[in-house]
Regions:
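Active-site recognition of the HExxH zinc-binding catalytic motif
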Residues: 35-48
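Metalloprotease/metallohydrolase-associated module, dominated by Zn2+-dependent proteases
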Residues: 1-15, 21, 27-30, 51-178
Length: 178
């Protein structure tokens, strides 16, 4: 599957009796790919068992996902630091492993060839940066799990994930953009 920025994988049931469609981004590191693949397989199994009557990431899916992960966890496929985070995550999995900062950090650490970009949490408050495909922004304070960042052109505020990859701007003054 070609790389996507918005989601790691996808399950689409065929409601007309044909085969289901399951996709996973092919550019994910192996541990992340495996977790995403099992996540989507759990959606398929949940759909086959319960149909459309259950929430996509409800209790039924969570239980199915944990069951699907059991043989993988028993086989000790993951590195110890990733395994510990996956076990913690499996106690109450979120809709995306990207929503679990600790798990995402462990999965990214495995990938030695990761992006040369910094993450938002690595830059100082007040620093200017650009998210890929966005306008210049200024990092603000952390609010619960995300950072409040101001887009310089519009003054709009966005809540940005701490592990979002950013390009730091080396400027003397933010007025260089205005």
């Amino acid at each position: 599957m070609r790389p996507r920025k918005t989601k790691l994988g996808d399950f689409r049931p065929n409601l007309r009796g044909g085969p289901h469609q399951l996709t996973v981004n092919g550019d994910l590191p192996p541990s992340h790919f495996l977790l995403t693949l099992v996540h989507e397989i759990a959606h398929m199994k949940t759909h086959e068992t319960f149909g459309l009557k259950v929430n996509p990431h409800g209790k039924e899916w969570q239980n199915t996902f944990a069951k699907c992960m059991e043989p993988i966890m028993e086989a000790k496929i993951y590195a110890p630091e990733i395994e510990a985070e996956v076990r913690r995550y499996l106690s109450k999995p979120k809709a995306s492993c990207s929503a679990d900062t600790r798990l995402l950090r462990a999965l990214r650490a495995e990938n030695e060839h990761s992006s040369p970009l910094l993450t938002l949490e690595e830059i100082e408050e007040g620093a200017l940066f650009v998210l890929p495909g966005r306008k210049p922004m200024k990092r603000g304070k952390k609010r619960r799990t995300r950072y409040l960042c101001e887009e310089l052109d519009s003054g709009r505020t966005f809540a940005v994930h701490p592990l979002a990859e950013v390009q730091l701007l080396k400027l003397k003054d933010e007025r260089d953009f205005l």
